[in-house]
């Protein structure tokens, strides 16, 4: 049995800027600002400098799910580029992590990337 890939951490602004290849397994984070139950979609927002970045997430595989608007979430899933709406993460896991230290998570992602580069691995 083939297990899915564990998912590379990408920062939300990298996902929204189109820096993640189509079909990639990824992990990212953001504050849940909108949950559309009818379309099974969540919008996660993240602040980077003075800019707000959105990540759209399809929640069909993780429903039923209790959305807590304003709370911090981490999503694990596959990225699908769509012609009309940009990119959508098809969530396999969507976890509320309210209270997590975001600057520390961002630092850990940067440190992990640096470590993998030094070892000759990919991002």
From Swiss-Prot:
Annotated compartments: Nucleus; Chromosome, Telomere
Biological processes, Gene Ontology terms: negative regulation of telomere maintenance via telomerase; telomere capping
Mutagenesis / variant outcome for changing residue 119 to Q: 2-fold reduction in binding affinity for STN1
DNA-binding region, residue intervals: 2-123
Gene Ontology MF annotations: single-stranded DNA binding; telomerase inhibitor activity; telomeric DNA binding
UniProt KW Transmembrane helix keyword: no
UniProt xrefs under InterPro entries: NA-bd_OB-fold (IPR012340), Ten1_animal_plant (IPR029146)
Gene3D superfamilies noted in UniProt: Nucleic acid-binding proteins
Gene Ontology CC terms: chromosome, telomeric region; CST complex; nucleoplasm; nucleus
Keywords: Chromosome, DNA-binding, Nucleus, Telomere
Membership in a protein family: Belongs to the TEN1 family.
Function, in words: Component of the CST complex proposed to act as a specialized replication factor promoting DNA replication under conditions of replication stress or natural replication barriers such as the telomere duplex. The CST complex binds single-stranded DNA with high affinity in a sequence-independent manner, while isolated subunits bind DNA with low affinity by themselves. Initially the CST complex has been proposed to protect telomeres from DNA degradation. However, the CST complex has been shown to be involved in several aspects of telomere replication.
Subunit (UniProt): Component of the CST complex, composed of TEN1/C17orf106, CTC1/C17orf68 and STN1; in the complex interacts directly with STN1.
Name of the protein: CST complex subunit TEN1
